[in-house]
Amino acid sequence: MAGKYKKIVIVTGGSSGIGRCTASALRDSGCIVYEFSRRNIPMEGITHLSVDVTDENAVNSAVKQIIQKETKIDAVINCAGFGISGAVEFTSTDQAKAQFDVNFFGTVNVNKAVLPFMRHQGNGHIINISSVAAVAHIPFQTFYSASKAAISSYSYALENEVKPYGIHVTIVELGDICTGFTQMRQKSILGDNEYGGRISRSVSQMEHDEQN
């Protein structure tokens, strides 16, 4: 089989930004790449699977589909995510839950799906994309920061669970990068007057830093 000696890699959030660049780089290095995202933006040499990472059944089905074809999964890179910004007191619980559903639980869903296969094969590499926001505690990005801190803490503990089975876990805490993430951020300046204009200034600074 042509793919027998090639690395089989899943990249989530591969339709844009860091995920798309990662998927392209892996393809160019000779890996067989499966890209999970809701949007199908075709990339030559990369297989798109329509997967919402918050849908555990869809994730499990996609992973099984890959195993049936390739018989293994060497690595997964969890890039799927988005950001919200605004004051905590003006952010709804539903908005906060949605942030965690994608950024944290989406990562958990994918990892849970691949772990049984990696454990059985005795090797694998899980790479979870976190952020400096996990440790920098950026105001008015509180729920985004919390979701990334959850990923980092989870990843350190997961590494201790699975390393006896030949599975490695890597956390990447990225800084500001110029991608479409800035335009996709769900921004809110509700309460800006109550906070002395600090919310709008903070959001503007975030956008400036990410574009430079």
Segments (PLM) and residue ranges:
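The beta1-alpha1 cofactor-binding region of Rossmann-like NAD(H)/NADP(H)-dependent oxidoreductases
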Residues: S50-S61, T93
